[in-house]
């Protein structure tokens, strides 16, 4: 199967660069699946999971806090404020941050910061999904 070059960059560092068979990411208008030779595209992406298949068939998962996706026929670039490999996520820290976000939503009720609190909770849930998906992928490799 054909491949293309994928680069995932956070504000701090390059997280991944290599040849992949496909990538799945959530754009602002829905889910995107990118294969080699895809039509050029530039779109914002939502906080969530970037899942891609390596040349050897193994899959990897990276959490992104949102950002931009640029697609060229043989090159795909993800630019994110924050990007963390699923294998580097800490489940305990995620659960604690999720719990605090839920408590803040309940305690503040209809406060003006409600949308920000919901966005924080959504990011923690996306991190949790990235962690769980990574764990599942690691178990299937064993």
Swiss-Prot record:
Q: Which Gene3D superfamilies match?
A: ATP synthase delta/epsilon subunit, C-terminal domain, F0F1 ATP synthase delta/epsilon subunit, N-terminal
Q: Which GO terms describe its cellular component?
A: plasma membrane; proton-transporting ATP synthase complex
State the compartments where it is located.
Cell inner membrane
- The principal location of this protein is membrane
Question: Which CDD domains does the record associate with it?
Answer: F1-ATPase_delta
Q: Which GO terms describe its molecular function?
A: ATP binding; proton-transporting ATP synthase activity, rotational mechanism
* Membrane topology summary: Peripheral membrane protein
Question: Which GO annotations describe the biological process of this protein?
Answer: proton motive force-driven ATP synthesis
The alphabetical list of record keywords is: ATP synthesis, Cell inner membrane, Cell membrane, CF(1), Hydrogen ion transport, Ion transport, Membrane, Transport
Under InterPro entries, the record lists: ATP_F1_dsu/esu_C_sf (IPR036794), ATP_synth_F1_dsu/esu (IPR001469), ATP_synth_F1_dsu/esu_N (IPR020546), ATPsynth_dsu/esu_N (IPR036771)
Q: From which domain of life does this come?
A: Bacteria
Write out the function statement from the record.
Answer: Produces ATP from ADP in the presence of a proton gradient across the membrane.
Which protein family is named in the record?
Belongs to the ATPase epsilon chain family.
Q: How does it assemble?
A: F-type ATPases have 2 components, CF(1) - the catalytic core - and CF(0) - the membrane proton channel. CF(1) has five subunits: alpha(3), beta(3), gamma(1), delta(1), epsilon(1). CF(0) has three main subunits: a, b and c.
Q: What is this protein called?
A: ATP synthase epsilon chain
Q: What is the lineage of its organism?
A: Bacteria, Pseudomonadati, Pseudomonadota, Gammaproteobacteria, Pasteurellales
